[in-house]
């Protein structure tokens, strides 16, 4: 089946070209343009040429007097051309800065000056090939749909043809825009043109819409800030009365626009300070305190109320001499006030332990050793021992403050003292008192002498006492305690005799004879301890725990020996 296209009426009708140019201009400016184009794209010239397209019928779906539906294969290589006119930005730095936020740009002055150049582009030598679905109806107009991209090539001629880079850039960008035009915009343009030609109702509706739009745009616009508000204030926030407002000229827009409503300013201030956050839409939650609400003064007062060394909430105020920087924990304060059981004193020791500079694991080991080696008399003493052990890491110093004896002459201002606790006498074996003195005290006496002579601060004295206590041989203490656990009752005279042994260590001077005697007694005690260990390796039934501690230093013998 052959068709003859009468192409001459399209080339001779001037009104057709005018309407087509308007539709093409609207279509080219509808989609977002690249930032290099700073003005509208105007179609100044359109010519379909004298060579018609070639159509090959592939399928006819519907054929009647007032309707037609078919699928065609179209190919076009004619002399049609299209001329566009616009303005472009020649300064690439200005184009780059326009596409970036203002707070992120360096804001150059001379280099960012815009430079717009008029541009004229002519599109010619179109080569099209594709499959077209054509539907015609007198009531609905013409509908053309491309099943594939019909654009094969075209020629772009512009003002910048002498610059190869600009020429290639324009060629690539215009080809991309034309592909979108053929697939999306051109079918809509053809459909509207057909409705104008064959559907009078559509034509009348467009005329009415155009008239309504023109009537709405006529006349001067109304300025909402032309009249002053009901409660005006000046630029400094001072309220203005009616006489001041009357003296102002309504013609001067600068003065009138500076009159802002006080109510609106208060609302804006409330929005800005909403929950003291950057977001104006932060949801409010009941019974919740936001971190932004707490000012530095409030947080400082709250911290000082809990961790101050002079705080009355802490029963042992000198236990925080080493380090005061800890987070405010109200639970530790409450527990230290009302502790009466073993559970409460462990909770308060946790609150104090968080402020120390030592790790929790290290403090927990020391705490366990102190609890295992002692049998506290009262609950308050036990709580004080656990509190002090988390800071001093000493097995003897805390009990001197928690349960002082009237015989001992100690200084109340001294935060740390090296003598051993009187309670340890309850667990010592029934050996003469001089053996206990010789086996476990030389290191402590040397630490006390050095502390009195040097006169250092409390922190340095604490470190020195820790080193001396750790230097005390643990083997002798473990053997004595193991024998004590096996015995039926502790020695009743130990608490009365032990304070007399503390007095020589509190003394500032010691004779050399005592040092020699202590060394001899230490050697004798060591020999006696080894003999007792050899005689009773497995005779006791309550020594597995202490044997395990001793075996940590020396491995046990093989089974069967």
Curated annotation (Swiss-Prot):
InterPro entries: Mdm34, SMP_LBD. Signal peptide: none annotated. Residues 208-233, 299-474, 531-561 are annotated as: Disordered. Residues 370-380 have a biased composition (Basic and acidic residues). It is a multi-pass membrane protein. Residues 359-369 have a biased composition (Basic residues). Keywords: Lipid transport, Lipid-binding, Membrane, Mitochondrion, Mitochondrion outer membrane, Transmembrane, Transmembrane beta strand, Transport. The keyword Ion transport does not apply. Residues 314-329, 386-399 have a biased composition (Polar residues). Component of the ER-mitochondria encounter structure (ERMES) or MDM complex, composed of mmm1, mdm10, mdm12 and mdm34. This is Mitochondrial distribution and morphology protein 34. It comes from Emericella nidulans (strain FGSC A4 / ATCC 38163 / CBS 112.46 / NRRL 194 / M139).
């Amino acid at each position: 089946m052959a068709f003859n296209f009468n192409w001459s009426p399209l080339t001779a009708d001037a009104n057709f070209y005018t309407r087509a140019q308007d539709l093409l201009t609207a279509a080219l400016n509808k989609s977002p343009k690249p930032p290099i184009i700073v003005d509208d794209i105007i179609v100044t010239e359109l010519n379909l040429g004298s060579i018609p397209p070639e159509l090959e019928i592939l399928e006819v779906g519907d054929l009647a007097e007032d309707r037609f539906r078919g699928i065609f294969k179209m190919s076009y290589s004619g002399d049609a051309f299209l001329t566009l006119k616009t303005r472009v930005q020649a300064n690439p730095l200005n184009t780059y800065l326009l596409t970036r936020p203002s707070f992120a740009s360096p804001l150059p002055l001379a280099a960012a000056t815009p430079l717009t150049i008029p541009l004229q582009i002519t599109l010619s030598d179109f080569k099209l090939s594709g499959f077209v679905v054509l539907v015609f109806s007198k009531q609905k107009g013409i509908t053309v749909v491309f099943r594939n991209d019909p654009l094969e090539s075209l020629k772009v001629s512009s003002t910048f043809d002498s610059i190869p880079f600009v020429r290639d850039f324009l060629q690539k960008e215009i080809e991309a825009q034309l592909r979108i035009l053929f697939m999306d915009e051109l079918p809509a343009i053809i459909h509207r043109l057909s409705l104008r030609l064959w559907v009078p109702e559509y034509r009348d509706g467009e005329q009415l819409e155009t008239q309504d739009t023109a009537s709405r745009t006529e006349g001067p616009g109304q300025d909402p800030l032309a009249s002053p508000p009901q409660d005006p204030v000046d630029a400094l926030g001072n309220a203005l009365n009616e006489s001041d407002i009357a003296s102002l000229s309504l013609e001067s827009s600068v003065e009138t626009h500076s009159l802002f409503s006080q109510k609106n300013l208060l609302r804006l201030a409330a929005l800005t300070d909403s929950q003291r956050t950057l977001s104006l839409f932060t949801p409010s939650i009941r019974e919740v305190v936001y971190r932004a609400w707490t000012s530095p003064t409030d947080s400082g007062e709250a911290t000082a109320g809990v961790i101050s060394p002079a705080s009355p909430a802490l029963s042992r105020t000198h236990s925080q001499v080493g380090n005061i920087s800890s987070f405010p924990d109200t639970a530790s304060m409450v527990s230290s006030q009302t502790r009466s059981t073993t559970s409460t004193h462990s909770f308060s020791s946790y609150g104090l332990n968080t402020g120390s500079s030592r790790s929790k694991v290290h403090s927990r080991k020391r705490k366990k050793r102190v609890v295992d080696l002692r049998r506290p008399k009262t609950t308050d003493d036990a709580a004080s021992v656990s509190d002090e052990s988390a800071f001093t890491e000493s097995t003897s110093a805390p009990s001197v403050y928690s349960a002082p004896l009237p015989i001992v002459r100690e200084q109340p201002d001294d935060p740390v003292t090296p003598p051993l606790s009187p309670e340890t006498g309850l667990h010592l074996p029934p050996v003469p008192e001089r053996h206990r003195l010789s086996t476990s005290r030389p290191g402590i006496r040397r630490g006390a002498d050095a502390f009195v002579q040097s006169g250092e601060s409390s922190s340095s004295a604490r470190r020195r006492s820790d080193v001396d206590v750790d230097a005390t041989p643990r083997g002798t203490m473990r053997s004595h305690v193991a024998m004590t656990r096996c015995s039926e009752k502790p020695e009743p005279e130990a608490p009365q005799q032990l304070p007399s042994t503390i007095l020589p260590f509190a003394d500032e001077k010691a004779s050399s004879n005592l040092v020699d005697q202590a060394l001899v007694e230490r050697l004798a005690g060591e020999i006696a301890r080894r003999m007792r260990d050899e005689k009773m390796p497995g005779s006791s039934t309550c020594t597995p725990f202490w044997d395990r501690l001793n075996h940590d230093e020396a491995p046990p013998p093989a089974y069967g020996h």
